[in-house]
């Protein structure tokens, strides 16, 4: 599988030179796993069962995804790397090329094309192998492990930035269609419990207010005319 991963990553810049590989063999099954991260955004995961390419994935592929996510998160937590960021499975798999191949005595193939492995025990077997061996590899290759975590953190930050941009765009379109004044300098927070709206008199007052505000939680709305002191009026 190491040669296969090397072939799949031809033309790409690897994040680490060493291709990670594990294997295990029992009387009932055989498991091989190979992993390598690259400086690209795409994800490549290939899985095989009894030399059949399981195009629709299956339990062995689920075990690979789950265990890799756990191992990287555990390593990052142990080394106190980017503790302020929660790495998702998608963050961790970005740039990853992973291959898992299993052999089972009685394979159960599912799906429309019968290319999905359904043997439930293979998920836990693949997980056990990776959960045992991958942390050992990361401990022995801390430089490569840190590089992988850094790569995952970049993916996480990009995901969060994209989410924030979508929320701001959505919020802006809601404000534009709700009839609210166009001069509203909105805040970035979407939590109403911490957000504040300051109404000021005219554009001249709005300028200094915008400069002095906390743009994360404070919005500024300039309006025309004198603002009535409601307390005095009542």
Kindly label every feature range from the protein language model.
Residues 1-234:
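GHKL-family ATPase ATP-binding module
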